[in-house]
A protein has these predicted regions:
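Long, contiguous binding/interaction regions
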Residues: 1-42, 50-120
Length: 120
């Protein structure tokens, strides 16, 4: 998985413009996490894609957007995964490396789960 971290304007319409670049280039986003960050009036947007060439294409396009202040491709050692899975005992939160979290989800045979990658 290839993870892109962006610092963007924290205002309406920015996510649509960012995702428009993925749509125009027919790049599927596997996970997306967005939230306030350390920079006032900015948000961090973290997206993951499967294909490295697609990630590099997206990076080139995203850097041209006025709403994007910083864009970087995060190496695997800078990534972490988290998930929420539904079990017979209730919901369970998981945090760890992507492969580790995916393995736990698979072993749990949970009918419902959500997983995302994050990075700084």
């Amino acid at each position: 998985m290839h993870v892109i971290s962006l610092i963007v304007k924290n205002e309406f319409g920015v996510m649509q413009r960012v995702m428009g670049e993925f749509t125009r280039n027919k790049i599927n986003v596997e996970t997306i996490v967005v939230g306030k960050c350390e920079v006032p009036k900015r948000s961090r947007m973290v997206l993951s894609v499967i294909d490295k060439d697609a990630a590099e294409t997206a990076m080139g396009r995203l850097r041209k957007l006025q709403d994007v202040y910083d864009a970087e491709l995060i190496p695997s050692e800078g990534q972490s995964a988290y998930a929420l899975i539904s079990t017979s005992n209730g919901n369970v939160g998981l945090v760890g490396g992507a492969a580790q979290v995916e393995e736990i989800i698979e072993r749990s045979q949970s009918e419902k789960y959500v997983m995302a990658l994050n990075a700084l």
